Amino acid sequence: MGKLALAAKITHVPSMYLSELDGPHKGCRDSAIAGHREIGRRCRDLGIDTIVVFDTHWLVNSGYHVNCAARFEGVYTSNELPHFIKNLPYAYDGNPALGQLLASTATAAGVNTRAHSETSLTLEYGTLVPMRYMNEDRRFKVVSVSSLCTVHDLKDSATLGRAVRRAIEEEYDGTVAILASGSLSHRFAQNGVSEQYLHKMWDPFLEQVDLRVVELWQRGEWATFTAMLPMYAEKCWGEGYMHDTAMLFGALGWDRYEGSVDIVTPYFASSGTGQINAVFSV
């Protein structure tokens, strides 16, 4: 049947878009942009038709949700950081059939998930930023999964991730990539001093925990990482409470994962938060 061909944990910092524009920050995120373009290149080489994004900017207060409209088009300004991302045009095709499969398979696994194909829902910037650089030619269809889950258990998100892989491999006729779109630690710099933290972590503790996590990945200590994920998410202000990461590792096998990581964009600080682009073998 289908194939899960690529899995990654990625940054989506809005300063990537700012990095394109003339001004004092032009070029500040060239490395992150290059990492996204490299992941996009790999997706093309692998024959991927659809990218599923676990988006930590899609906030939900009940259930899990899949945005699988047939078409996404508009002009986006971030309500969180309108001085960073403003008037960003986008247009991508969706994949309603795959989105429905993901939702039904997750629900059958015990995690109530709704697919929205006939919808006015738009995409959030956890999806729009990576698609800008990975999907410039609009080759890939896009499906977004809500991953800023306010009252949800990480174990349910891991179950959803497992269901996503099962749906792809057992029910779908095609080749898919999954992206966990969110930071590592995610404590924004305090208002009034944020300009000083464009390339700095908010606190050395957060940086040291992030670096230890990357080391665990590089050493293949997956059982240790998955065991610490709930506390890591809590103590280090995990973006979206790290539900995107739980979904990713659920799809990879959780503590039984035996693969390896390829760091595409090395760990970097952005506005107090910890960021990376990393591809995991599947």
Task: Write out the residue ranges for each language-model feature.
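Non-transmembrane, aqueous-exposed alpha-helical and coiled segments at domain scale
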Residues: 162-176
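Beta-strand elements within well-structured catalytic alpha/beta cores of enzymes
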Residues: 49-55, 174-184, 248
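Flexible, D/E/H-enriched segments
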Residues: 1-49, 61-159, 170, 191-282
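Short loop/turn segments at strand-loop or loop-helix junctions that form parts
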Residues: 9-13, 55-57, 182
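Short, conserved secondary-structure transition motifs
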Residues: 184-190
